[in-house]
Amino acid sequence: MRLSSAGFNPQPHEVTGEKRVLNSELWHACAGPLVSLPPVGSRVVYFPQGHSEQVAASTNKEVDAHIPNYPSLHPQLICQLHNVTMHADVETDEVYAQMTLQPLNAQEQKDPYLPAELGVPSRQPTNYFCKTLTASDTSTHGGFSVPRRAAEKVFPPLDYSQQPPAQELMARDLHDNEWKFRHIFRGQPKRHLLTTGWSVFVSAKRLVAGDSVLFIWNDKNQLLLGIRRANRPQTVMPSSVLSSDSMHLGLLAAAAHAAATNSRFTIFYNPRASPSEFVIPLAKYVKAVYHTRVSVGMRFRMLFETEESSVRRYMGTITGICDLDPTRWANSHWRSVKVGWDESTAGERQPRVSLWEIEPLTTFPMYPSPFPLRLKRPWPPGLPSFHGLKEDDMGMSMSSPLMWDRGLQSLNFQGMGVNPWMQPRLDTSGLLGMQNDVYQAMAAAALQDMRGIDPAKAAASLLQFQNSPGFSMQSPSLVQPQMLQQQLSQQQQQLSQQQQQQQQLSQQQQQQLSQQQQQQLSQQQQQQLSQQQQQQAYLGVPETHQPQSQAQSQSNNHLSQQQQQVVDNHNPSASSAAVVSAMSQFGSASQPNTSPLQSMTSLCHQQSFSDTNGGNNPISPLHTLLSNFSQDESSQLLHLTRTNSAMTSSGWPSKRPAVDSSFQHSGAGNNNTQSVLEQLGQSHTSNVPPNAVSLPPFPGGRECSIEQEGSASDPHSHLLFGVNIDSSSLLMPNGMSNLRSIGIEGGDSTTLPFTSSNFNNDFSGNLAMTTPSSCIDESGFLQSSENLGSENPQSNTFVKVYKSGSFGRSLDISKFSSYHELRSELARMFGLEGQLEDPVRSGWQLVFVDRENDVLLLGDDPWPEFVSSVWCIKILSPQEVQQMGKRGLELLNSAPSSNNVDKLPSNGNCDDFGNRSDPRNLGNGIASVGGSFNY
């Protein structure tokens, strides 16, 4: 077979170079609009499996099973492209390319590189037309009919003053041969025809009906002529051509030898005969395989060539992801996606495609989502972690671009510019409401000081924790005390001006208090005095130390404090002043003898914790700050008596004393405490134990106390922020272990979802887990398991399983012993084999709703605890997972407008879970059960 070639390499003669440019443009036009050759010198991926398909398509014979396999030959080879030469058959004008490849060794694959283009753009001309020949076009006695718009666009303009209008055209083919045609405009109706010279061209090229011809008018005002043969199977192979089996053996042997010796080998690529490109740029391969997630059920579109040399997108659905030939080519990405096409006319389309050929309609970025699925509890040490990964490695493994690499473990893609996307990021969505959290500042500052921490370090750490926008995990720098004092002095100057303005406003508001409110507060104070007498008896303080005059003065003092609290609730600078006051005490290194309680009481003096926007900030769980205390310290610190004070006009109860007998430090005795109370203007010093401190009301959208009619001996009467903290109760087996964060407005329990396990261990690694049998009701009280019996009965171990687009199923989870067995059974029930075990690659996620109405990722809890707490299971598609993230961001960006908390219905039904508006309900993005897919 004689060949004429034109390549990228410079030729010795100028004429040859000119021919190279022409043939290059025409070669791409004849190859097709979807063909793109990689540039010389770039890195490519070669698929021997795809090369075999080209041989099978050319010879119309599949690969025989007796052809030996090469186990050492990988299904994809990373190679360096040294040369590309474009060829065309002299007799048939069939275009093909010759490529010289050299496999890269492991060390060369690890070397960083600058990625070249995704391929040389197909040099499709802009001024051309392509027509499929009809029977009349190929007849020897007729001419070639040219569409009117095509003739006016491509051919030189005719002189319509002549009768008939006609001209002579000269066109060049791929081999630089000239062909002359007579272009005439005639007939009834009149049309453009090529007459003289056309029959000679058809006979010389042996064109038949179904073949296509292209006419191109290039930038040099030259007319080019190309041919596209119709794909017709060859019934008789020439004797000079090797047999199909020999060609298969040859290409496999050449590739295996080159891979073993890192030597060069040559391949031929026929774009018109090959079903798909089997040599693609490495950048294109990496982008499709490692940076695009696909899953079963996902919609996609794919480009196809039309008859007129244009492209069209066809829509389809992914129906499966598996190896095309798992026996001979295991772990190969070649045609690993099974698809179903929408149009009935797409029967000739391939039932399997490769990842780099399709365009998923829903793409998943590889960096962590801004609203990730969080672990509800810290994972117990010693137990297998999420999906079999170690907890320390989970953050990096989840973000690794090669996590699900099945064959190219040695690849290094640092030079591709995608590495910043892979870095684990700290999710700051849960920290938006913590920047002005005064209660957090008060508790952290006071408790750390009581533990004997250096005040300067405590202040620096606290200020950094409050003001750091990103909570850096790599290099947390300490703030110098001098810089801290300078910042605090500036803030105090600014706040002093604001306080003067607020004092004027407060005086006006205080004058507007109605007489009815004062009478109501007086009645509340009388009730409080009776409760305080019970408190003193409970604490063992003799009543002889409480003169009636002091009690009466205390009553007047509390009345004035409660009135002042109503006014201070409108003071936006109160919380900021409290933070600055505490920081100034901690930041001063010249006051080592300051009482451990002064910092806390100075903050406690502020009676309002409203933010500058007039709303209530979300707060982090208090047990995050107190988790390092022992059982005795926790129980004593939170051993508060029931105050039963009514709510003021702002919705907050009065202060309540918190007693902690364990906070006895050297040099900080009763005298220091007395001085602190005198600074606060307290006249009822003897009414409070010497080591008592006053905690402000717990900030949040939900009311913190509820009227109770029980006696003082009621074990549920010792409440802190609506939570029973009696250490003798069964609800508190270990001091602080069952202290839960109380929901804010909308019922949202604020937590800190971290993507880094190291950062997570610093703040919440020591938090004790709560029992799954306890939950928080709408009033915010922690209920015991015996009180939940009538509300959430657990009659059997059958659990409902939901999947969008499918009927719900019921499953007995008691017959399973691990998460792996459960995932396998769920995959079998819903036809998702191989998808649920690897959610990172497939995009499918399993979540469940526990009996506390929380949406959790399957695998968060140990298996026995999961069995006892699971309520229902939901299978989320990749689209639903993405909708959850969007819904979470909308909830964080929008302020809640009510205190309504949606709970599971009393009958224990989970069917309407996806339709509730609880912010914790991440299933708002889940399609309703039984609905159809919406693409």
Curated annotation (Swiss-Prot):
A molecular function GO annotation: DNA-binding transcription factor activity
Stored PANTHER family: AUXIN RESPONSE FACTOR 4-RELATED, AUXIN RESPONSE FACTOR 6
Polar residues bias: start-end ranges: 583-624, 661-689, 896-909
GO annotations of cellular component type: nucleus
Chain ranges of the PB1 domain: 796-880
SMART domains in UniProt: B3 (SM01019)
Induction comment from the UniProt entry of this chain: Repressed by miR167.
Region annotated Disordered, chain positions: 536-624, 645-714, 896-917
Lineage: Eukaryota, Viridiplantae, Streptophyta, Embryophyta, Tracheophyta
Tissues expressing this chain: Expressed in the whole plant.
Swiss-Prot/TrEMBL domain comment: Interactions between auxin response factors (ARFs) and Aux/IAA proteins occur through their C-terminal dimerization domains III and IV.
InterPro entries reported in the protein's UniProt record: ARF_dom, ARF_plant, AUX/IAA_dom, B3_DNA-bd, DNA-bd_pseudobarrel_sf, PB1-like
Keyword terms: Activator, Auxin signaling pathway, DNA-binding, Nucleus, Transcription, Transcription regulation
Assembly and interaction partners: Homodimers and heterodimers.
Name of the protein in question: Auxin response factor 6
